[in-house]
Regions:
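Eukaryotic N-terminal targeting leaders
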Residues: 1-3
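Short His-Asn-centered micro-motif
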Residues: 25-26, 125, 230-232
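Generic N-terminal leader segments that precede the first folded domain
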Residues: 21-23
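Non-heme Fe(II)/2-oxoglutarate
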Residues: 46, 174-188, 210, 223-320
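Non-heme Fe(II) oxygenase catalytic core, chiefly the N-lobe of the double-stranded beta-helix
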Residues: 8-11, 16-19, 28-224, 237-246, ...
Length: 320
């Protein structure tokens, strides 16, 4: 008997297993989005009506407030539970979303452009999770999530993904049970002796190099309230905003209480993410065991966003 899900339709399940992502349309309301973005421009220190004040092309903003996903976007929360095998597997600390907006404003030069960069040649390809050592079964980043807070049209700075890149990353991580460290747009084996020249390690991985092997690319255009849910190993990149219509998204992580399990006794207990990983590897099951201790990293962005938060709080106080 086919497994039943709280929210996902058979078509959505099939799409996720084939392509590694699904889009939940209208997962939260325009009113909710408007409430959360009401002070966006004050926080940025920019004027929405004066592009000369848009001095940064892309801004990763700090978080000021959070809300349970269950109340903010009930449909997305139901889909997240379906993808990860049930609410009991999800880390309760990863069940909130915040207002840490990622804003893509473009530039004057891009607005005048007549030629556009091919997705394969974009310069920001990566997998998420700059705060931990990566293993195939890492629980810290169990899904890649993109809630959309502004309408995003073609060439308007949408996130691009590469569904066939997921297979490359999965196989790479399966071959590196020692874990790999995310550094800029690369992955470096955690036990490498080549600390000063990591690119000399046979296990060195460059996202910008490996993306050249990919042929499938999807531009995540959408409308306010849409939420894209992706496999955690989905290669993705920011794109250029040629339209200069402000693009606003967030990128909240979802964590698990325990690592993914690719060798369950009952095959019916595999989550959809686990099933997609196994499919990417071309196997029915896999006994994966990390050979080094799991550990977290404090990324440089944390310090940067703390400074940004203090600056934003000052602007908000001055507004009042």
């Amino acid at each position: 008997m086919p497994k039943t899900y709280e929210y996902l339709s058979p078509e959505q399940v099939a799409h996720f297993l084939e392509h590694g992502y699904i889009i939940i349309k209208g997962a939260f309301s325009e009113e909710k989005a408007a409430q959360w973005t009401a002070n966006l421009w004050v926080r940025l220190g920019m004027d929405p009506g004066d592009k000369t004040t848009w001095t940064r092309e892309r801004v990763h903003m700090p978080v000021h407030k959070r809300e349970l996903v269950e109340t903010f976007a009930p449909k997305a929360w139901a889909a997240i539970k379906d993808l990860l095998g049930g609410e009991e597997r999800i880390d309760e600390h990863a069940s909130t979303w915040g207002d840490s907006f990622i804003v893509n404003l473009g530039t004057d030069e891009l607005e005048k452009a007549t030629e556009f960069v091919h997705p394969r040649d974009m310069d920001n390809w990566h997998v998420d999770g700059d705060f931990f050592i990566h293993y195939l079964d890492s629980p810290e980043q169990a899904l890649l999530v993109v809630p959309i807070f502004s309408n995003i049209a073609h060439n308007g700075g949408a996130t691009y993904i590469s569904p066939d890149g997921l297979e490359l990353i999965a196989r790479y991580l399966a071959e590196h049970p020692e874990g790999v460290t995310p550094v800029d747009l690369t992955l470096i084996p955690s036990t490498t002796p080549h600390t000063s020249n990591p690119e000399q390690d046979p296990g060195f991985w460059s996202h910008l190099k490996e993306i050249k092997r990919c042929s499938k690319f999807v531009e995540l255009t959408g409308e306010v309230g849409d939420v894209v849910l992706m496999h955690p190993l989905m290669l993705h990149t920011a794109s250029k905003n040629y339209l200069r219509v402000p693009r606003v998204i967030t990128n909240p992580p979802v964590g698990l209480k325990q690592p993914f399990n690719f060798n369950r006794e009952d095959e019916g207990e595999y989550s959809l993410v686990e099933r997609k990983t196994l499919r990417a590897l071309g196997v029915d099951r896999l006994e994966f065991r990390p050979t080094t201790e799991r550990r977290r990293i404090v990324p440089e962005r944390v310090k940067i966003q703390e400074r940004m938060k203090q600056e934003e709080e000052t602007r908000l106080r001055n507004l009042n």
